[in-house]
Amino acid sequence: MATSTSTEAKSASWWNYFFLYDGSKVKEEGDPTRAGICYFYPSQTLLDQQELLCGQIAGVVRCVSDISDSPPTLVRLRKLKFAIKVDGDYLWVLGCAVELPDVSCKRFLDQLVGFFNFYNGPVSLAYENCSQEELSTEWDTFIEQILKNTSDLHKIFNSLWNLDQTKVEPLLLLKAARILQTCQRSPHILAGCILYKGLIVSTQLPPSLTAKVLLHRTAPQEQRLPTGEDAPQEHGAALPPNVQIIPVFVTKEEAISLHEFPVEQMTRSLASPAGLQDGSAQHHPKGGSTSALKENATGHVESMAWTTPDPTSPDEACPDGRKENGCLSGHDLESIRPAGLHNSARGEVLGLSSSLGKELVFLQEELDLSEIHIPEAQEVEMASGHFAFLHVPVPDGRAPYCKASLSASSSLEPTPPEDTAISSLRPPSAPEMLTQHGAQEQLEDHPGHSSQAPIPRADPLPRRTRRPLLLPRLDPGQRGNKLPTGEQGLDEDVDGVCESHAAPGLECSSGSANCQGAGPSADGISSRLTPAESCMGLVRMNLYTHCVKGLVLSLLAEEPLLGDSAAIEEVYHSSLASLNGLEVHLKETLPRDEAASTSSTYNFTHYDRIQSLLMANLPQVATPQDRRFLQAVSLMHSEFAQLPALYEMTVRNASTAVYACCNPIQETYFQQLAPAARSSGFPNPQDGAFSLSGKAKQKLLKHGVNLL
């Protein structure tokens, strides 16, 4: 036992402690500290030592919080540093070696918390639904996988485990990207990634989600989440071979980013209702100008199923600014804050787990109505009246905005049924919107024109847009009603407190907001969020995984996928042949002996800050000179993180020098292994360290790194 413990401690010398502490179980003076310890790593630590460390850290956090009104995020001791994260009564703590950069230590802790929440949901509910022994086993699996796959460079940058793309044929990378794009055209699929032997081949996910999906292969087969295995059998969706679908939880910011794909990828949801087959080809392509829609003008506009046809004036259609006969008032739209802005919880609304939610992603754009005057609206009818646009002139000469209105089906009545809920907003006088330039603009009321939302102008780059999402909100007087057929599943965020995935009759104890609402589908999917889950800022989705030997296709999808056997079959058959071919080619083309590396006269490391990917030429077994290079990289990476204005530096000792440069999207480090001429140790124009910048720019070009 002593031998195994010392071996484990040696292999994880940089990862000393990790524990999860529940402060709600230690309230009184006589409550034992051990009662609040949910998990402690390493488990071989004596219980008395666990209590001592947990009690001291919890006391420090409480003391600092009382003094500064904010909990600490990092506590530095003489030989250890502790990254700290407070989540209500729960305390997450990761103890690392002092040599590890502060930013990496905090990122590792955030990553651990993200892993747990992704597969288990909110920590409070997870420990209510599962035993502590089961969750401890899962924690052990997570930590073991992290320590096994984290190299010296990965622990400095906390980067993802990616395949070295310089060793893969570009056509194979293109094929992997095409597989993901093909899967995206299937119903309910949002985005995904492809892994080979635990390494990233291609991904559409943001780095935070990609990191969580990377550990899925090591997760237990028997998922302990409710409806994880039973849901497919409940709904008659027999899973194909080597396919698994489990419920997962993403943050609201991650959910927004998953729905912010270009228009071309979202138009497939508009062609799903009957009668749209012929009109689906008329949607403007990605990158095209929205002004081309003027060619389809016919002088007629169809609104949503509950709107009145062709009102003669805004005042007649919407008297007193209220909704009558389905007309929407001037406060019917509000933009959701982009990911990372937490100053307004009331402005966050998500339409998830439904096709309507995906259609509404169309309606994204920053809009300043204070300078827009609409003397005469141009009316356009498209796709047999199922999607119509109103063109609005923009005074600054940019491409015109297009206002859009949806029609679920031409056969629906123009007036709403009794149980139809017409989405609207709370009535703030001037809701704020965040524009591309970072300035906040006031959205003024324009009665008669607020029932439509703008769609984005053509995006020059085929990437996810970063514009706010415009989604309707549920009218306070009609919270308990249901959406019409075809729009069920649009989960509303009532008063911005929590998302409504709960069955009618359930309430969320957060102020006066009720968490009632329509379920994600007509048949009532059993894996919907409970009020407690939704109020904790998590959104439930499905993770579809298809394993083909060493290749894994992982897709994040909306909740209805779990009960849609046709969609599952479509995803499976559309990707099966391509996945088999890709697996064979990767197996044949990748180097078999990774340890055999060609000798090089220099070391380099290139870190992509946006994708959190790393590229380097270091050998598997580091030499003493490589160790000095890693020490220099760790030091300079910390300096770049603490000093954003710093963009270039060189560090040296008596035997070697390391050059580094960075910008907002990347960091690059370079070391010449040959002994530098005239390395005198003090500034000298003839010192070899001053020529490292030019050598780095020249030699790294062949690796695809451009420092010019």
UniProtKB/Swiss-Prot annotation:
Q: Which domain of life is it from?
A: Eukaryota
Instruction: List cellular component terms (GO).
Output: BLOC-3 complex; cytoplasm; cytoplasmic vesicle; cytosol; lysosomal membrane; lysosome; melanosome; membrane
One BP term from GO: melanocyte differentiation
Q: Does the keyword Phosphoprotein apply?
A: yes
Query: Which molecular function terms from Gene Ontology are attached?
Result: guanyl-nucleotide exchange factor activity; protein dimerization activity; protein homodimerization activity; small GTPase binding
**Compositionally skewed regions (Basic and acidic residues) per UniProt:** 319-331
| Region (Disordered) location | 269-331, 407-490
What are the UniProt keywords, alphabetically?
Albinism, Guanine-nucleotide releasing factor, Hermansky-Pudlak syndrome, Phosphoprotein
Q: Which residues carry this modification: Phosphoserine?
A: 355
Q: Which Pfam families match?
A: Intu_longin_1, Intu_longin_3
What task does this protein carry out? Component of the BLOC-3 complex, a complex that acts as a guanine exchange factor (GEF) for RAB32 and RAB38, promotes the exchange of GDP to GTP, converting them from an inactive GDP-bound form into an active GTP-bound form. The BLOC-3 complex plays an important role in the control of melanin production and melanosome biogenesis and promotes the membrane localization of RAB32 and RAB38.
Q: What disease is this protein tied to?
A: Hermansky-Pudlak syndrome 4: A form of Hermansky-Pudlak syndrome, a genetically heterogeneous autosomal recessive disorder characterized by oculocutaneous albinism, bleeding due to platelet storage pool deficiency, and lysosomal storage defects. This syndrome results from defects of diverse cytoplasmic organelles including melanosomes, platelet dense granules and lysosomes. Ceroid storage in the lungs is associated with pulmonary fibrosis, a common cause of premature death in individuals with HPS.
Its quaternary organisation is: Component of the biogenesis of lysosome-related organelles complex-3 (or BLOC-3), a heterodimer of HPS1 and HPS4. HPS4 and the BLOC-3 complex interact with the GTP-bound form of RAB9A and RAB9B but not with the GDP-bound form of RAB9A and RAB9B. The BLOC-3 complex does not interact with RAB5A, RAB7A and RAB27A.
**Name of the molecule in the record:** BLOC-3 complex member HPS4
Organism expressing this protein natively: Homo sapiens
Q: Which gene encodes it?
A: HPS4
